[in-house]
C-alpha cells in the first residue's frame, strides 16, 4: 500500500482556515470541507500522477464540492508532499512562492 501523503504545516494551516470559514457560514459545513479534503489527499497515494502539472513539478487536485479549492502537491523521492490548499482566486504567485520557499 502506498504511503499516506505528507501534509506540510502550511497546508494544514490552509485547511484549518478554510474549514473555520466554512463553519462560520453554516455549522457543520467546515466538517464537510475537511472530509472532502481528506478524501482528495488520501486518493493521491493511489494515483499521484493523475493530475496535470500546473507549473514546475507542482500538481493540483481540485475539490469537487468545494470547487474553488485545490490541493497543491509535488512528488519528492516517491512521496506525495501536500504543501497548500488554495482558493482559486488567490494569486498564483503566492502558490509558486510557497513552493519555491520549500525547495
Model segments located where?
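Enriched for short, Lys/Arg-rich terminal
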Residues: 66-70, 74-103
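Arg/Lys-rich, positively charged N-terminal/basic patches that mediate binding to nucleic acids
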Residues: 1-34, 103
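Generic structural signal for secondary-structure transition and capping sites
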Residues: 20, 27, 42, 46-49, ...
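Short, hydrophobic secondary-structure boundary micro-motifs
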Residues: 31, 52-54, 94
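Solvent-exposed, amphipathic alpha-helical segments
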Residues: 17, 36, 40-43
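Basic/aromatic recognition patch in beta-strand/loop cores that engages polyanionic ligands
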Residues: 39, 46-81
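Residue-level signal for well-ordered alpha-helical positions
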Residues: 18, 47, 95-98
